[in-house]
Amino acid sequence: MSFRINTNIAALTSHAVGVQNNRDLSSSLEKLSSGLRINKAADDSSGMAIADSLRSQSANLGQAIRNANDAIGMVQTADKAMDEQIKILDTIKTKAVQAAQDGQTLESRRALQSDIQRLLEELDNIANTTSFNGQQMLSGSFSNKEFQIGAYSNATVKASIGSTSSDKIGHVRMETSSFSGAGMLASAAAQNLTEVGLNFKQVNGVNDYKIETVRISTSAGTGIGALSEIINRFSNTLGVRASYNVMATGGTPVQSGTVRELTINGVEIGTVNDVHKNDADGRLTNAINSVKDRTGVEASLDIQGRINLHSIDGRAISVHAASASGQVFGGGNFAGISGTQHAVIGRLTLTRTDARDIIVSGVNFSHVGFHSAQGVAEYTVNLRAVRGIFDANVASAAGANANGAQAETNSQGIGAGVTSLKGAMIVMDMADSARTQLDKIRSDMGSVQMELVTTINNISVTQVNVKAAESQIRDVDFAEESANFSKYNILAQSGSFAMAQANAVQQNVLRLLQ
């Protein structure tokens, strides 16, 4: 055993161990006071890098949730505004339905039209003023907007809201077959004219649909009335509704004279003597109407005193009489009734409540006037048109003109909006079309909102899990660290005692010098 004074190895060793114990004790106190296992890079360099990445991801996810909530707020703003617009459209249609009956006078229809115009102004006002944070929502400018809903770039949801102003919604496409003139040549006593089978092309943008063949004749259950019924039976599939107007009209007012051997649709009416000018006593119309249940044809006089024969169920109209009887009828569709029998087919109107074209082909489709070379009347209107006049083009495309005589009467159009019966029908279709368009936009917005809600739910859970993962790395385990602190505290105290003892040992050398 050796004794040295200059170098107290035991004291130095105790000091070194004590310094380390104090360092560990300070680190433990720092962790306990901050609640963090990693307070500086030296504590866990790789763990710190991972924890910092997770903290950034969690913060970004939190902002993504706020972004999604902002987007939901925008969507809900637009949705509530469109809900009000749909209520306006429902009111417009209700007023159009009210106007679509001839118990209304022109003045009462004008009052309804005035109400509708005010409603349209409010509809456009909603479209032009609805905004979120200064951005127009329903004017058509809100297109392809993106919302960041993730922690990393390009994790976005896109949203677009089409324009809901009256000039962008409520489209109605109308196509009416061409005038048939005197009509088609009637064959034999059965008055069987032709058979027609229509093929509607690219109904849904891809598929064609062919409907069953219909006989066009003067018999009951035939004609464009039967064709219209079949089309309407499958209107949901075809996307098209049909209506018809079969009418024969005199070119001039009824002339005085005698109609001999009058036959309508194969039913013999006989001779009508001493018909007065303009059929003043109703003799001619009464004779025709007395057998209307058998002929399917009803007679009336228009304001000019011209005779109109109207097919009740849409069958063709064939009129035949002895020589010179056509003059009494006033010519027009009756110009050749004393010669070879002809039939008036009438006009078929197809209506689609959107802006797409109606493409028709098929078997003998030209026989009902739907060949493009025959001058099909066609027109597309939108809801804004209700503010103006439905001109002659709209009147013809909507089927308001059954023949040339009616086209002449409606040469200036059919008036503004619901001021006419046919105009009220058009406005009803416009309101339906506009509501369908708004419902589609709202449906798309609803899908976006559901996507955003689902995203919020997902990233909220992800954010919690990311925070948990960060906590596992960065936060201190107090139970574990308390145990460490107790250990380091005891070691620090025992180290101080050991250092004191090591210094005291050197004093033993003095005993050797006594």
From Swiss-Prot:
InterPro entries: Flagellin (IPR001492), Flagellin_C (IPR046358), Flagellin_C_sub2 (IPR042187), Flagellin_hook_IN_motif (IPR010810), Flagellin_N (IPR001029). Keywords: Bacterial flagellum, Secreted, Virulence. Coiled coil: none annotated. Signal peptide: none annotated. GO terms for molecular function: structural molecule activity. The keyword Secreted applies. GO terms for cellular component: bacterial-type flagellum; extracellular region. Disulfide bonds: none annotated. SUPFAM superfamilies: Phase 1 flagellin (SSF64518). It is found in: Secreted; Bacterial flagellum. NCBIfam families: PRK13588.1. Heteromer of FlaA and FlaB. FlaB is located proximal to the hook while the remainder of the filament is composed of the predominant FlaA. Belongs to the bacterial flagellin family. Flagellin is the subunit protein which polymerizes to form the filaments of bacterial flagella. Important for motility and virulence. This is Flagellin B.
